[in-house]
Design a protein with these regions (language model features):
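Predominantly a Rossmann-like dinucleotide-binding segment in NAD(P)-dependent oxidoreductases
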Residues: 122-206
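Rossmann-fold dehydrogenase core element
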Residues: 103-121, 141-146
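Short, Asp-centered acidic motifs that coordinate Mg2+ and/or phosphate
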Residues: 30, 65, 145, 224
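N-terminal Rossmann-like dinucleotide-binding module
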Residues: 1-45
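Contiguous beta-strand/loop segments that form the cofactor/metal-binding neighborhood of enzyme cores
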Residues: 183-258
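Beta-loop-alpha module in the N-terminal Rossmann-like domain of NAD(P)-dependent dehydrogenases
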Residues: 16, 49-108
Length: 260
């Protein structure tokens, strides 16, 4: 069994806690969160050791793996603290606020021989994996255009009070929503993004962060396409993510449930 701990018990931290707590190959030993109410509840209702300091938790419990599910601005320091001690890390997305932070974490993970996974779940969905296989097999011929989209009803009125409304904490549609689509484009095309042009990031309801992003993108292979993402769209009951790639012999289009 893998001795594991969780840092952060917000929405995603709670989800990971439920999944890891039930996993037959995981020994979830401790959780860490600064919220006193959460600490009290976990002390009363679970067998896990409860901490308000992630460094003390890591030094005391000595886990083999750590799940980091905190606001993005804390990712770098927490991930590096674990990796430098040879602890494997699963980090929620987006990985970091800057490319420099991300590159440093990747370098340390490689040097320490640690797993350092980021929570982009679309990579594990069957339709997207089949799309990747078909694209790599060349079934649509030479690709000439892609369209990556995501829409959902996250911010439908002016509001604040959470880290997602704070740009310095990593809030905003680009970081929180569009990062899923950007990662999917990288994954399926097998080519990293190199350029963005004509970027438009409107604030529809939010005061400090973007509620949508529209841009023309280019990847290393030279393939170009569009990005269209909005988390202030109430025509969708929940987040929907899709990718379309057109080639001179056909077209591939997929979301979480269908491929055509």
């Amino acid at each position: 069994m893998i001795k594991t701990a969780i840092i952060g018990l917000g929405k995603m931290g709670m989800s990971h806690c439920a999944l890891l707590g039930a996993h037959p190959e995981v020994d979830l030993v401790a959780i860490c969160d600064p919220d006193g109410l959460l600490q009290s509840a976990f002390k009363k209702l679970t067998k896990f050791q409860v901490y308000d300091d992630y460094k003390r938790m890591i030094e005391t419990e000595k886990p083999e793996a750590v799940f980091v599910a905190t606001p993005t601005r804390f990712h770098s320091e927490m991930v590096l603290y674990a990796l430098e001690r040879g602890i494997h890390v699963f980090c929620e997305k987006p990985f970091s606020l800057t490319s420099e932070e991300g590159e440093k974490m990747v370098a340390v993970a490689k040097a320490k021989g640690c797993v350092n996974q980021v929570g982009y779940h679309n990579r594990f969905i069957g339709t997207f994996n089949e799309m990747k296989r078909l694209f790599a097999a060349g079934v649509i011929g030479t690709p000439f255009h892609f369209m990556g989209e995501a829409y959902g009803p996250v911010v439908l009125k002016p509001k604040g009070g959470t880290w997602r409304a704070d740009k310095k904490s990593g809030g905003g549609c680009l970081m929180d929503y569009a990062s899923h689509v950007l990662n999917l484009i990288n994954y399926i095309t097998g080519s990293h993004l190199t350029e963005a042009r004509g970027t438009f990031m409107p604030r529809i309801f939010s005061k400090e962060v973007d509620d949508a992003i529209y841009a023309t993108l280019k990847v290393e292979s030279g393939l170009q396409g569009q990005l269209s993402v909005c988390w202030s769209d109430d025509t969708h009951r929940k987040m929907t993510t899709s990718l379309k790639i057109e080639g001179d012999k056909g077209k591939l289009e997929a979301d979480a449930t269908t491929l055509k």
